[in-house]
């Protein structure tokens, strides 16, 4: 934290846009609080030694940011982030009610490699090895990793096998 505080004090930014791996979120948020800098990130906090993410660790900073007159905006990447904006827009402008919502993501590029990810490989592996989670009939349900899947036909990509995963949208929508 101290090195970030020194860096922020030397540059005096209005906002820090955290694009680092999610292990650093709390450290960067703490440095922002100590230096009076607003905060924005693209992915929620996850401990480095455990494949487990949830926003509660970052939400615990809410009162401190408010008391300091600072803003902290969480999950402003594509998913979560853009997916939440699309969902809110659709709910406001296109539907009276939404009873079912799937947020799907397709990585169609493989760069001619057997294993290619659209984000940090370690984080992707941690995501796909966690239990799946979804909300149905008023309750949360869990599945074994990658056990629920179906082929989806993606525009401009074609059919791809797609898997139910627990992802940050379930924490942020």
Model-derived features: positions:
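Residue-level detector of anion-binding/catalytic polar loops
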Residues: 14, 38, 71
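Redox-cofactor binding/interface segments in oxidoreductases and associated redox assembly factors
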Residues: 16-18, 41
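Active-site-lining helix/loop region of Rossmann-like oxidoreductase modules
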Residues: 92-173
